[in-house]
A protein has these predicted regions:
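Helical hairpin unit composed of two closely spaced alpha helices linked by a short loop
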Residues: 271, 275-383, 387
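Interfacial loop/helix-cap signal at membrane boundaries in integral membrane proteins
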Residues: 9, 46-87, 149-161, 214, ...
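Membrane-helix cytosolic exit motif
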Residues: 242-246, 250, 291, 333-341, ...
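Single conserved hydrophobic/aromatic residue that forms the stacking wall/gate
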Residues: 1-7, 12
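Membrane-interface alpha-helices at helix entry/exit sites of multi-pass transporters
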Residues: 112-126, 197, 359-376
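Alpha-helical transmembrane segments and their helix-start/interface "positive-inside/aromatic belt" motifs
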Residues: 19-35, 118-129, 189-197, 227-232, ...
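Juxtamembrane inter-helical linkers in multi-pass membrane proteins
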Residues: 13, 56-63, 104-105, 251-276, ...
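Alpha-helical transmembrane segments
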Residues: 81-90, 224-241, 321-332
Length: 452
C-alpha cells in the first residue's frame, strides 16, 4: 500500500511501519491518547445550557472566538472540560522562553542539560495553571450575562454566583492541566510533538463539517458556486506552498582541509550545511494564535458594548488582527530561529573539524556569514508564514465567504503532518530500515550534509 504526499515526491510505504514493535506501540499509544482527547471535548461543564450556548456561538460566525474554537476541536463552543485547549500551556511556554533570555538564572538552567530543562518544564506547568485560572475566571464571569439570540440564559446552574464561578474555574483548569499531561505523555511514549498533535487533531475534526456547511450554503444560494471553487483552488495552492516551503533548504558549501594523522590522510571532502528556508516551522503562527486567543477567550464571553467593539476589531481578516498577527509572526520567527541556531557555535564546530566555507575565513567571519544567510532566510520564511496565514482570511472577508478554515489552520495541519512523517521516517532509518518514503534527491542530500 502506498500513500503519496501531494507535491513532495514522498511516497509512504506502510509495510515497514508496523514491523518494529516499539514504533507500532508508539503509534497505537498516540492514537489512543488523541481518542481520549476527543472524548473529553464532549464532556460538558456543569451548569451550562448547551442549546443556548450553541445558539450563541452560531450567532458568532466569523468572530475571533469562533476562529479559536477551531483549535480546540469545538470544545470552546460547547464549553466542555477542554474548552481552554492547550493555549494556556503555549502562552506559558512563550513567557518562559522570553524570560530565559532576560534572567541569567533561567538562562543557566536552559544550558544545564536534562536537569535544567526539567526545572524549566516545572515552571512552565505552574505558569500554565496560573493562566488557565485567569482565563477560566474571565469566562465564568462572562457566562453569567450571556444569552442566546432568543433570550435564553446560558447559565442554568442553581448554585450561587461564586459557587458556579469556582466550579467552572476548577473544571476548565483541570481540563487544561490534563491536556498538558497528555501532550507530555505523547512526547515520551508516543510519536510526534504532543501539543502540536492535539492542536492538529482539534483542527482536523472540523474539516468535514466546514466542507459540508459550505456545500449547504451553495445549495441554499447563500454563496455562489464560483466562490466555493475559488476557495478550493486557494486551499490546494496553500497546501502546495506549505509543502514546498517546509521542505526547502539553502545549502551552504563546506570544504574540509586535508590533514595527516599517523600514516593516513583525512579530510579533503566536500559537503554542505543545510539551512531550512523556514527554520521556525509552524511555531510562529501557533504562538501568535495563542497570544491572541488569551484575551479573546475572555472578551468573547463579555457582552459589554465597548468590549465587544474591541473584540470585533480582532476578527480574522480585520486590519488590527492582521497587523498584530503579522508583527507577532515576524517576532517569533526570528526569536525561535535565534534559540534553535547559534552561528558562533556552528562556526566553532566547523573550524574544530577542519571545515570551512570557500571564500570565507574560519571563525568569526564564518559566524557572520552564516548569521547573515540565516537572517535572510528567516525574513523570507516570515513573509511566507504571514502570507499563508493572513491572505486567505482577508480574501474570505472581502468576498464574504463564511469559511473559518483559513491559511493558519492549513499551515498547522500540513506542517505538523510533515513533521510527523519525518519523525517516523527518522525512527525507521534509525532502526536500519529502508524508511517509508521513497528515496529522493532531498533525502540523499540530507544524508550527505554536514551534521553539527
Amino acid at each position: 500500500i502506498r500513500i503519496c504526499l501531494v507535491g513532495s515526491e514522498m511516497c509512504i510505504r506502510d509495510r515497514n511501519i508496523f514491523r518494529i514493535e516499539e514504533l507500532r506501540q508508539r503509534i497505537y499509544f498516540t492514537l489512543a491518547i488523541l481518542f481520549v482527547f476527543r472524548l473529553g471535548a464532549h464532556i460538558p461543564t456543569p451548569g451550562i445550557d448547551g442549546v443556548a450556548l450553541t445558539a450563541f456561538f452560531e450567532a458568532q460566525q466569523g468572530s475571533i472566538l469562533r476562529f479559536f474554537d477551531m483549535f480546540t476541536g469545538g470544545a470552546l463552543a460547547r464549553l466542555t472540560v477542554f474548552a481552554l485547549g492547550v493555549m494556556p500551556y503555549i502562552s506559558a511556554s512563550i513567557i518562559m522562553q522570553l524570560l530565559t533570555v532576560v534572567f541569567p538564572y533561567l538562562e543557566r538552567l536552559s544550558k544545564e542539560g536534562e536537569a535544567g530543562r526539567k526545572k524549566i518544564t516545572i515552571y512552565t506547568r505552574y505558569g500554565t495553571i496560573v493562566l488557565s485560572l485567569v482565563q477560566a475566571f474571565g469566562i465564568s464571569a462572562g457566562l453569567e450575562s450571556m444569552a442566546a439570540p432568543d433570550g435564553s440564559p446560558v447559565v442554568i446552574s442553581t448554585m450561587n454566583t461564586w459557587g458556579f464561578r469556582g466550579l467552572t474555574v476548577i473544571t476548565l483548569t483541570a481540563g487544561t492541566a490534563f491536556l498538558m499531561w497528555v501532550g507530555e505523555q505523547i512526547n515520551e511514549r508516543g510519536i510526534g510533538n504532543g501539543i502540536s498533535l492535539i492542536i492538529f487533531a482539534g483542527i482536523v475534526v472540523d474539516i468535514p463539517g466546514a466542507i459540508i456547511n459550505s456545500i449547504r450554503l451553495v445549495q441554499t444560494d447563500q454563496i455562489q458556486p464560483i466562490l466555493l471553487i475559488i476557495v478550493g483552488v486557494l486551499m490546494v495552492l496553500v497546501i502546495f506552498a506549505v509543502i514546498f516551503m517546509e521542505t526547502a533548504y539553502r545549502k551552504i558549501p563546506v570544504q574540509y582541509a586535508k590533514r595527516m594523522q599517523g600514516n593516513r590522510m583525512y579530510g579533503g571532502q566536500s559537503s554542505h550545511l543545510p539551512l531550512k528556508i523556514n527554520s521556525s516551522g509552524v511555531i510562529p503562527p501557533i504562538f501568535a494564535s495563542s497570544i491572541l486567543a488569551f484575551p479573546a477567550t475572555i472578551t468573547g464571553f463579555i457582552t459589554i458594548p465597548w468590549v465587544q467593539a474591541v473584540s470585533a476589531q480582532l476578527m480574522p481578516g480585520r486590519l488590527l488582527y492582521s497587523l498584530l498577527f503579522v508583527i507577532m509572526i515576524f517576532f517569533f520567527a526570528f526569536f525561535y530561529t535565534a534559540i534553535q541556531f547559534n552561528p558562533v557555535k556552528i562556526a566553532e564546530e566547523m573550524k574544530r573539524h577542519g571545515g570551512y566555507i570557500p571564500g570565507i575565513r574560519p571563525g568569526k567571519k564564518t559566524a557572520e556569514y552564516v548569521n547573515g544567510v540565516l537572517s535572510r532566510l528567516t525574513f523570507g520564511g516570515a513573509i511566507y508564514l504571514a502570507a499563508v496565514c493572513i491572505l486567505p482570511s482577508i480574501l474570505f472577508v472581502a468576498f464574504n465567504v463564511p469559511f473559518s478554515f483559513g491559511g493558519t489552520a492549513l499551515l498547522i495541519v500540513v506542517g505538523v503532518g510533515l513533521d510527523l512523517v519525518n519523525q517516523i521516517e527518522a525512527f525507521l532509518l534509525n532502526q536500519n530500515y529502508d524508511g517509508f518514503m521513497r528515496k529522493t534527491k532531498r533525502r540523499q542530500a540530507r544524508a550527505a550534509s554536514l551534521k553539527l
